[in-house]
A protein has these predicted regions:
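Short secondary-structure boundary segments
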Residues: 60-62
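Ser/Thr/Gly-rich flexible loops in soluble cytosolic domains mediating phosphotransfer, phosphorylation
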Residues: 6, 78-110
């Protein structure tokens, strides 16, 4: 069995982000993508990424101000980092959010 690749969403507290995770995971499952999508508070980012290899980090709009700092920390490790577009987040559009993550992953591999 193929191991699942991990995508992490980081936010302030995690309530609305867990809804987005569920929507993104449903789209991934629907398309047979071997992905595991999880949400954590941004304060735990270093700890979570250190213990679990991730292929992509997305920040929720509430913590988007930390985007550059997060990129500076994790992109040198080969982990692409992006922010979820506030409009996509507001609509809780799991498909568009997942597409954004996949674009980030592809751009990192070039």
């Amino acid at each position: 069995m193929m191991s699942k690749k991990k995508i992490y969403l980081f936010c302030d507290a995690g309530m609305s982000t867990s809804i987005m995770v569920n929507k993104m995971q449903a789209v991934a499952n629907e398309h047979g993508m071997p992905l595991e999508i999880s949400a954590y508070p941004v304060a735990r980012a270093a700890e979570v990424v250190e213990t679990e290899k991730t292929i992509c980090i997305l920040l929720g709009p509430q913590v988007r101000f930390l985007l550059q700092k997060t990129k500076d920390k994790f992109e040198p490790l080969g982990i692409p980092v992006g922010g979820i577009d506030p409009e996509i987040y507001g609509m809780m559009d799991g498909e568009k959010a997942l597409k954004e993550a996949l674009k980030l992953i592809k751009s990192q591999k070039k």
